[in-house]
């Protein structure tokens, strides 16, 4: 969805309900309405085909995505809740995707009828739900990336944290996302324009542009820079480990890192075009041709919903990584699931050799950690007493 009332790159529901009432060039929805043929005029065959295609595609994405995310929620809560301390983040991601996908029926209905049928409350809820779930997803991914970074490079810090801190972080991501969404939730209103209804914010074009720019910074630019920095440092640590002269064990945490990074990259691939389109519409003076604007709006809309549709496949791989690792710990004889020597900083390795057990056994929370059993000659820790995913 998009929220650009002064441009044709608008939220699909908004683009579908433009009014035929003439408006002055500076009005918020003047260029918006120009992106569609007047609702009083018969639709062309091309419009009918495009509407049918986009409606069918979004409906298919909705069915696949809802089933996939519901399956992820069930599997994660049943299989990992008692043993995997990071399960709450997977639940967060799947829940955000599920809520976002549940808006598809409203969007398809608006595309087909070119009329808003869901009242003032629908305007506020559906527009704000879009930004709420988007921010909840990227904030959760940022927290997960930070956790992986800390588990690999600062393992002792992870075992000293209280048991419920991850639940507090998960709740915090939703509260912060809600805080950023409140302005649009309060400002959206249903406005009558002739025979049609239109969802518009109460603020002016400048405030709207500033708000969208802020949301771009909080959902793409800021988290992107932070996650990029974390993974750059992790990549450097792994490169250093490749030069270390000791036998390395198989590290399930490396696979988990790649899966989390894959989810992050998929988010960027699907939402960056959407945001570039939104900002282009805000800062570009000359509007695109209505047909071009409509096509771009279709494509960016499908990309954002496609992200929530594809994510469950990566979530399944992530939870499977948890289960495989836990199964390996149970089957491993002897010292609590030790699978081989894993590099660490030398002082930490000496501590473990003296104690004869994993540092994670001192943690008050259940974890899925490996034992750091051998000292590296140099370089940062590459496995941690943290979780494998």
Swiss-Prot record:
The keyword Transmembrane applies. Residues 1-39, 328-366 are annotated as: Disordered. PANTHER family: G-PROTEIN COUPLED RECEPTOR, UROTENSIN-2 RECEPTOR. The chain crosses the membrane at residues 55-77, 88-113, 125-146, 168-186, 210-232, 259-284, 298-318. It comes from Macaca mulatta (Rhesus macaque). Disulfide bonds join 123-199. The keyword Cell wall biogenesis/degradation does not apply. It is found in: Cell membrane. It comes from the Eukaryota. Residues 1-54, 114-124, 187-209, 285-297 are extracellular. This is Urotensin-2 receptor. It is a multi-pass membrane protein.
């Amino acid at each position: 969805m998009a929220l650009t009332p002064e441009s044709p790159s608008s939220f699909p529901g908004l683009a579908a309900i433009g009014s035929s009432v003439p408006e002055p060039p500076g009005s918020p929805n003047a260029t918006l309405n120009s992106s569609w043929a007047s609702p009083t005029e018969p639709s062309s065959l091309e419009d009918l085909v495009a509407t049918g295609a986009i409606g069918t595609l979004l409906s298919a994405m909705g069915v696949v995505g809802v089933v996939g995310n519901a399956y992820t929620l069930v599997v994660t809560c049943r299989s990992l809740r008692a043993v995997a301390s990071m399960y709450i983040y997977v639940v967060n991601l799947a829940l955000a995707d599920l809520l976002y996908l549940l808006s598809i029926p409203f969007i398809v209905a608006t595309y087909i009828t070119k009329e808003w049928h869901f009242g003032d409350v629908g305007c506020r809820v559906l527009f704000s739900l879009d930004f709420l779930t988007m921010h909840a997803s990227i904030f959760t991914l940022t927290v997960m990336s930070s956790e992986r970074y800390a588990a690999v490079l600062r393992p002792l810090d992870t075992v000293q944290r209280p048991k419920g801190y991850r639940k507090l972080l998960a709740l915090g991501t939703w509260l912060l996302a809600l805080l950023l969404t409140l302005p649009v939730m309060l400002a959206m209103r249903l406005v009558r324009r002739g025979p049609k209804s239109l969802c518009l914010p109460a603020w002016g074009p400048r405030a709207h542009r500033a708000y969208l720019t802020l949301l771009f910074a909080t959902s793409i630019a800021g988290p992107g820079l932070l996650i990029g920095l974390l993974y750059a440092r992790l990549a450097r640590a792994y490169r250093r480990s490749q030069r270390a002269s000791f036998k390395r064990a198989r590290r399930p945490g490396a696979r988990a890192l790649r899966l989390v990074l894959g989810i992050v990259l998929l988010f960027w691939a699907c939402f960056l075009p959407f945001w570039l389109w939104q900002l282009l519409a805000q800062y570009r003076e000359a509007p695109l041709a209505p047909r071009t604007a409509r096509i771009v709006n279709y494509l960016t809309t499908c990309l954002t919903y496609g992200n929530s549709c594809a994510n469950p496949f990566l979530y399944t791989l992530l939870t499977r990584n948890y289960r495989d690792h836990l199964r390996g710990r149970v089957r491993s004889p002897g010292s609590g699931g030790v699978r081989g020597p894993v590099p660490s900083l030398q002082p930490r390795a000496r501590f473990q050799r003296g104690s004869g057990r994993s540092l994670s056994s001192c943690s008050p929370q259940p974890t899925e950690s490996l034992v750091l059993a051998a000292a590296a000659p140099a370089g940062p820790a590459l496995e941690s007493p943290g979780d494998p995913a």
